[in-house]
C-alpha cells in the first residue's frame, strides 16, 4: 500500500502543462478493496482542486486479472482545449467479462447495480467481436475459478424481481443524469 501511495503522490506533483487542475498529494490515501475477498485490489483516494472546487478522485487498482485480448491504448476526451490524455487500460471485452463474472458469482447477493448499467451502456455504444468477447469471458471465469452458468440467476425473475434488487436499481437510477433512458 505504501509503495502505491508514494507513486500516486509523485504523479500528483508531476510537472505538467497547467490546465487548472491541481492534485493535493497530502490527501492520498490507500485501502485494500474488500468487495470480494477472492481478488486483490487497492483503492486510492485523493483530492483534486479545480479553482476553489474540491473534486474527490478515486483510482481502483486490481492485481492478478487476465486482460483479453491485452491492454489497449485509450484516448480520453479533453474537456478544455488541451491534448487528450492517452493511457493503457483494459479492453472493453475484459471490462464486460469482469462485470459479467461478478454477476454470476454474486448471484442474488449482488448489489453492484452499476455493473448492469455499464454492460448495458457498453453494448449500446460499441460493437463487440463475439468470439473475442467469449474468449475474454472464458479467460476471466477461468482465472477467477468461476463456473460459467448457462442461466445466471442475475438474469432471472428470482433476482430481477426481488424487492431489494428493485430498490437498489431505483436508487442507482436516481443518481444518473439520464435515468429515463434505462
Predicted features along the sequence, with ranges:
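Structured mid-to-C-terminal alpha-helical surface segments
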Residues: 2-182
